[in-house]
Amino acid sequence: MKIDKSLLSGSTPMLILSLLSTQDMYGYEMVTELSRRSDDTFHLKEGTLYPLLHTMEKNNWVTSYNTQAPNGRERKYYRITPSGREQLAHKEEEWQLFSEKVSTVLGFGTI
């Protein structure tokens, strides 16, 4: 089943911060890891990801650094900051409340 993009767009920052909370990653790695962890349900385009990462860097939720990849090319990695971890915790709480209330309204989990 295909998921409406508008459902994903509001949760994308939380998903990216969650990925970065486990390890530093470069852009394409985030795209593939998000797809893998969601069993190919979430497909993030690089045209969506990089502006988001730029905004997150501006907000001091992530920092970036360049390093040389095994193939010799330069690769830009992103790392979550302490402020980003706080934001992630806030977004997770917000998501928990939101998903509980949507489920309640839809009648899921009730007898």
Question: What does each model-found stretch correspond to?
Answer:
Residues E57-E74, R79:
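Beta-hairpin "wing" of winged helix-turn-helix
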Residues S6-T48:
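N-terminal helix-turn-helix DNA-binding core of bacterial DNA-binding proteins
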Residues E86-I111:
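Amphipathic alpha-helical dimerization/coiled-coil segments
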Residues L49-M56:
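Basic amphipathic alpha-helical segments that dock to polyanions
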